């Protein structure tokens, strides 16, 4: 994913420095060329040898390292970098950068960089909230640097509050968002639905399905990485919200209908990957239903057909993609759905085929349009998301 990309990691003096070893390792696994620059204080928290072992590149601390190859190191590395991530970023380094002070390998290199630079502050809450630090971060943002809002939580000093460096996986997402993919969907608004709905029977019970939301979340994540403005309307799932995506959390089919129709007109692309209930209880009990007889009958009524509504109200130039999970006659049933609901494309899969069902990390899809059927091999849902977006982009161009 990151082959031929160079990532520069800047590590400063903070207890969170040890976590950047995981970030360096993750980047290397994605085939990035990873270089690490450390401040002298950072070496008190983690040994440079750790980064050298993980990246295969010399970890630079001293601006005047005589044992390194003869180049103006800070300039040559700055020219190579596709993105810089300074994490953890101490108040000291943030202050230096905001005022143009370049007195070590890290600050001199960043000063010479023309690529995007991300800064992830990590410090005590009182330090983070200090007006001087806040002003310094605003100054850096004014100069075009990207300052990542720290998380809140229990800090190494024993305090609880803002100032905690996000986890390496989150920092990785910022890097991937910047350099992993061509921004070929920039300027496009994409609405994606994901996950199951829940239809209440009483305060304790509800009707739902086995959808995990993985396919919809993969689509949202990949679309955002390719530059789209993404809105994800999601049922109740156990997946972390994708970064750089607006997530609207819903519970019932009615909730999803309202959330989708509120923003559908302004979207360029709508992908409905959610598994929405077709029926709901006609009457919802206010109290828990007690066991009385051996059998219980619940009257059901139809929910609103979201995809049908979208097809009927599709504006000119808007692309509408649905999903179809079948257990028999997959192509015939999916093609009928494509026509009946005025879709541009439908992604069909068979629940009975291993690797294509609910809650799996893989999928086996057939992309069906008015004129063709394209059968895909089994692949990860993230890769399948990329293929779906490629197909949509090709059909819209």
Place the predicted regions along the sequence by residue.
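A cross-family phosphate/adenosyl-ligand binding-site feature
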Residues: 1-118, 124-213, 217-397
């Amino acid at each position: 994913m990151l082959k031929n990309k160079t990532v520069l990691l800047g590590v400063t003096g903070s207890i969170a420095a040890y976590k950047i070893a995981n970030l360096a390792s993750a980047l290397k696994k994605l085939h990035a060329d990873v270089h690490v620059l450390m401040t002298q204080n950072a070496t008190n928290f983690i040994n440079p040898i750790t980064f050298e072992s993980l990246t295969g590149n010399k970890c630079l601390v001293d601006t005047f390292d005589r044992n390194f190859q003869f180049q103006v190191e800070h300039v040559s590395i700055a020219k190579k970098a596709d993105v810089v991530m300074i994490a953890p970023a101490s108040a000291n380094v943030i202050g230096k950068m905001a005022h143009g002070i370049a007195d070590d390998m890290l600050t001199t290199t960043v000063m010479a960089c023309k690529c995007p630079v991300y800064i992830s502050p990590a410090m005590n809450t009182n330090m983070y909230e200090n007006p001087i630090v806040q002003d310094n971060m605003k100054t850096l943002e004014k100069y075009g640097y990207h300052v990542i809002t720290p998380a809140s939580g229990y800090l190494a000093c024993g305090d609880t509050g803002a100032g905690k460096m996000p986890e390496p996986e989150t920092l990785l997402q910022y890097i991937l968002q910047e350099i992993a993919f061509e921004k070929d969907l920039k300027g496009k608004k994409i609405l994606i639905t994901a996950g199951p709905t829940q239809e209440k029977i009483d305060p304790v019970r509800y009707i739902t399905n086995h959808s995990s939301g993985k396919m919809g979340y993969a689509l949202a994540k990949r679309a955002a990485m390719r530059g789209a403005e993404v809105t994800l309307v999601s049922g109740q799932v156990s997946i972390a919200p994708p970064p750089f995506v607006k997530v609207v959390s819903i519970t019932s089919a009615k909730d999803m209908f309202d959330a989708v129709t509120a923003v559908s007109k302004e979207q360029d692309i709508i992908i409905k990957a959610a598994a929405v209930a077709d029926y709901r209880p006609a009457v919802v009990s206010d109290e828990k239903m007690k066991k009385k007889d051996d059998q219980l009958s619940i009257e059901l009524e139809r929910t609103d057909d979201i995809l049908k509504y979208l097809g009927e109200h599709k504006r000119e130039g808007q692309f509408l993609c649905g999903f179809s999970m079948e257990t028999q006659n997959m192509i015939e049933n999916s093609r009928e759905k494509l026509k009946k609901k005025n879709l541009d494309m439908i992604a069909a899969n068979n629940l009975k085929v291993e690797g294509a069902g609910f809650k799996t990390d893989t999928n086996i899809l057939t992309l069906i349009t008015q004129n063709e059927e394209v059968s895909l091999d089994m692949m990860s849902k993230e890769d399948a998301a990329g293929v779906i977006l490629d197909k949509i982009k090709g059909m819209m161009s």
